[in-house]
Curated annotation (Swiss-Prot):
Compositional bias per record (Polar residues), positions renumbered to this chain: 187-196
Pfam families with a match to the protein in the record: Hexapep
Keyword annotations of the record: Repeat, Transferase
Pathway the protein takes part in: Amine and polyamine metabolism; carnitine metabolism
Gene Ontology molecular function: transferase activity
Domain of life where this protein originates: Bacteria
Renumbered residue ranges of the record's region Disordered: 173-196
Annotated source species: Escherichia coli O139:H28 (strain E24377A / ETEC)
Keyword Cell membrane: no
Gene name per UniProt: caiE
Record's protein name: Carnitine operon protein CaiE
Function: Overproduction of CaiE stimulates the activity of CaiB and CaiD.
Amino acid sequence: MSYYAFEGLIPVVHPTAFVHPSAVLIGDVIVGAGVYIGPLASLRGDYGRLIVQAGANIQDGCIMHGYCDTDTIVGENGHIGHGAILHGCVIGRDALVGMNSVIMDGAVIGEESIVAAMSFVKAGFHGEKRQLLMGTPARAVRSVSDDELHWKRLNTKEYQDLVGRCHASLHETQPLRQMEENRPRLQGTTDVTPKR
């Protein structure tokens, strides 16, 4: 794992969290219990404090950064999709930020909200609870349905379970030269399926 002290501040990672070895955590970063930090994620706490609360996930290639004297926060059970950028913002409890979305400084995403993939949330945006946000710039298009929130929570549970699975079995290896016969398929831990 790539952890770096910066001006005397050392990242804090709860022992039950999983941080992929290729992720980079610098300086003032606080990672809570059961958090998943994916491959190539960059959490740069060299200006403002970065806080990832319990049960949240920061997926592959995500970037977190912020200005001095501000906290960039992912709330409890927050779900940050592949390639998203969070800069000086607050993601509410149980909210989802879709793949490759950008959330700018001072923006607040409300609890149980969903930001659609590829959305751009402008600086200073203040969302409400349970909004579906989409577009460039993003705007609230409607409320998140019970089914959508259930789907989000199943996906987050998959990542919470992945923490333990990674601690138990993820290790560096060499590739096989060919696929073995009857190669098994990986199974999830919930009945989540892609949203169509």
